[in-house]
From Swiss-Prot:
Pathway(s) this gene product operates in, as recorded in its UniProt entry: Cell wall biogenesis; peptidoglycan biosynthesis
Protein role: Probably cleaves the terminal D-Ala-D-Ala dipeptide of the peptidoglycan stem peptide. Shows weak D,D-carboxypeptidase activity in vitro. Acts on the synthetic penta-peptide substrate Penta-DAP (L-Ala-gamma-D-Gln-DAP-D-Ala-D-Ala). The catalytic domain binds weakly to peptidoglycan in vitro.
Spans traversing the lipid bilayer: 375-395
GO biological process: cell wall organization; peptidoglycan biosynthetic process; proteolysis; regulation of cell shape
Highest taxon in the source lineage: Bacteria
Keyword Isomerase among UniProt keywords: no
Source species: Mycobacterium tuberculosis (strain ATCC 25618 / H37Rv)
Protein name: D-alanyl-D-alanine carboxypeptidase DacB1
Top-level EC class as recorded in UniProt: hydrolase
Subcellular location per the Swiss-Prot or TrEMBL entry: Cell membrane
Length: 405
């Protein structure tokens, strides 16, 4: 009987593990935010009508995780530094920023890292990585009138022009071409499909504050991200050699179309030209987002990056604010840490187009598999467990039927 009781306990345990019954599930309170953290739930009020949907109501704010992703200290919305560290630079106007180690994922210092803001063009990293992961770089793409008609910064994509995915990526990342973003979105399946893929990538990278409404970063209904999420996205991107090479490129020959000749495209990131060891990054601006910026640099083998959201050009330009934050990070001892940029979902590893440069996956990353991906695994475990338990029960019954000597 003791053996049978053990088998019963084993059966219950296997069933619980296989189905997920009894395991805690993530929950959040989308409307619970301390008064001191005004952007914990929603982005700042818009200054124009660009986010008003054509019909219906705007989407509800994203659910706030019950605990801050990356560590409890990152739940603060003031300036957060490690104990004993020097004060952060005082000339950074961005309302949210972050300094982190590109290789270890250690967050060195931050301000309101999970505060929700609009990304502007720094969100183009997701279009770039979705394209790098799924498209062939030398694939030819015909420009369209819709590409040329997009609002904002453009690099010259138009009817009569043919561009490779690689050329579009350079136009996207070096000079923030919104026309290049829309051309790549067409290659990802068209606007609805592209946005679905981009948002899925953001989710698999751990971005719980991010909803992408446009591939270019132009403001749209429900557009949202955080300095922490942007840090996740760019850490992932910089481990890809195609991305790293493009954002570090200063000039590139971009093709023309029709009677319009090709020209030399210049990288618009001033950090690349003015900061020793700069690895590049991305600029951004819209009326609602304000100034946004991402930059990274290598100093004596230590690679750091910084993210700035909802900033201004005062008292110094965003790239100089980023430079001061990078200086601050490099002046802190290696190992200084207030939180962590979590590892991406393991499923991203199988779609990496550069297997020699794949990221490390820690044990915690395996726990972040999505519910949809986890369901077949749980069902399989439950079936196998049931067969094992059935076999053990049959063995136990056979033992009980044996004659006693």
């Amino acid at each position: 009987m003791a053996f049978l009781r053990s088998v019963s306990c084993l059966a219950a345990a296997v069933f619980a593990v296989g189905t997920g019954i009894g395991l805690p599930t993530a929950a959040g309170e989308p409307n619970a935010a301390p008064a001191a953290c005004p952007y914990k739930v929603s982005t700042p009020p818009a200054v124009d009508s660009s986010e008003v949907p054509a019909a219906g109501e705007p989407p509800l704010p994203l659910v706030v995780p019950p605990t801050p992703v990356g560590g409890n200290a990152l739940g603060g919305c003031g300036i957060i530094t490690a104990p004993g560290s020097a004060p952060a630079p005082g000339d950074v106007s961005a309302e949210a920023w972050l300094v982190a180690d590109l290789d270890s994922g250690a967050v060195i210092a931050a301000r309101d890292p999970h505060g929700r803001h609009r990304p502007a063009s720094v969100i183009k990293v997701l279009v770039a990585m979705a394209s790098i992961n799924t498209l062939t770089l030398n694939k030819s793409v015909a420009g369209t009138a819709d590409d040329a008609a997009v609002e904002g910064t453009k690099v010259g994509v138009n009817t009569g022009g043919t561009y490779t995915v690689n050329q579009l990526l350079h136009g996207l990342l070096m000079h923030s071409g919104n026309d290049a973003a829309y051309a790549l979105a067409r290659q990802l399946g068209g606007m609805p499909a592209a946005l679905e893929k981009i948002n899925l990538l953001a989710a698999k990278l751990g971005g719980r504050d991010t909803r992408v409404a446009t591939p270019s970063g132009l403001d749209g209904p429900g557009m949202s991200t955080s300095a922490y999420d942007i840090g996740l996205f760019y850490r992932y991107a910089w481990q890809n050699p195609v991305f790293a090479d493009i954002v570090a490129t200063r000039t590139f020959d971009f093709p023309g179309h029709g009677d319009h000749p090709g020209y030399e495209l210049e990288n618009d990131n001033q950090l690349l030209y003015n900061y020793p060891g700069a690895l590049g990054g991305k600029t951004g601006y819209t009326d609602d987002a304000g100034q946004t910026f991402v930059g990274a640099a290598n100093r004596d083998g230590r690679r750091l990056m910084t993210v700035l959201l909802h900033g201004t050009r005062q008292p110094i330009p965003p790239w100089e604010q980023a430079a001061h934050l990078l200086d601050y990070g490099f002046n802190t001892p290696a190992g200084t840490q207030i939180g962590t940029l979590i590892e991406p979902d393991p499923s991203l590893m199988s779609t990496d187009r550069n297997p020699a440069d794949r990221q490390r996956v820690d044990p915690q990353a395996a726990a972040r598999i999505s519910a949809a991906d986890a369901l077949p695994v749980r069902v399989g475990v439950a079936v196998i467990g049931a067969l094992i338990v059935f076999g053990l029960i049959m063995v136990a019954r056979a033992m009980n039927r044996r004659p006693q000597h």
